[in-house]
Amino acid sequence: MLEGVIRESITKANAKALKKDGYLIANVYGKGIENVNGAFKLNPFIKYLKEKKHLIFPVKLGDKTFEVVVQEYQKNPVTNELIHVDLLAVTKGVKSKFKVPVKHQGTPVGLKNKGILMLSKKRISVECAPEHLPDHYLVDVAPLDVNESILVRDLEKHENVKILDHDSIAVIGVIKAK
């Protein structure tokens, strides 16, 4: 479980001092809970996110424990370093909006025909309760030839999960190389 500290002061000077000490500024919020301003050690946070298996993960700030999902993050445009993260605290049975990653498997037929695989939608917007949240959408791209694509409507349907993206949006496809 990730452990962080609660920020007593939310001033700019306090945030700069925490960043200088190697902390990542975080906000935890959700339906029915009071917003919590916190900070996590940057390197352990990144390592934990890379190793986690599910979108929802536990964090501890002070004496409070939350089940959270990364809602949004900000990176420094020059150094590409993570500088801020918003964590949505989820409650069982309460519907929320999430962004679920798209993963692909297989080698498209179109690559042999001078095509290029284009992942046009990396995340799918969904609405559901946290207990029904899929960890990812897995797409088999092996049958795709040049100028073919997989649309949102072609994705696997999960029970109690409503996809918010329009049906006709391309998720992944093979385009002709120039």
UniProtKB/Swiss-Prot annotation:
GO cellular component, one term: cytosolic large ribosomal subunit
HAMAP family in alphabetical order: Ribosomal_bL25_CTC
Family recorded in the similarity comment: Belongs to the bacterial ribosomal protein bL25 family. CTC subfamily.
Classification via Pfam families: Ribosomal_L25p, Ribosomal_TL5_C
Keywords recorded for this protein, A-Z: Ribonucleoprotein, Ribosomal protein, RNA-binding, rRNA-binding
Functional note: This is one of the proteins that binds to the 5S RNA in the ribosome where it forms part of the central protuberance.
Signal peptide (UniProt feature, chain positions): none
One GO-annotated biological process of the protein: translation
Keyword Ribonucleoprotein: yes
Subunit structure: Part of the 50S ribosomal subunit; part of the 5S rRNA/L5/L18/L25 subcomplex. Contacts the 5S rRNA. Binds to the 5S rRNA independently of L5 and L18.
GO molecular function: 5S rRNA binding; structural constituent of ribosome
Protein name stated in the entry: Large ribosomal subunit protein bL25
Transmembrane segments: none
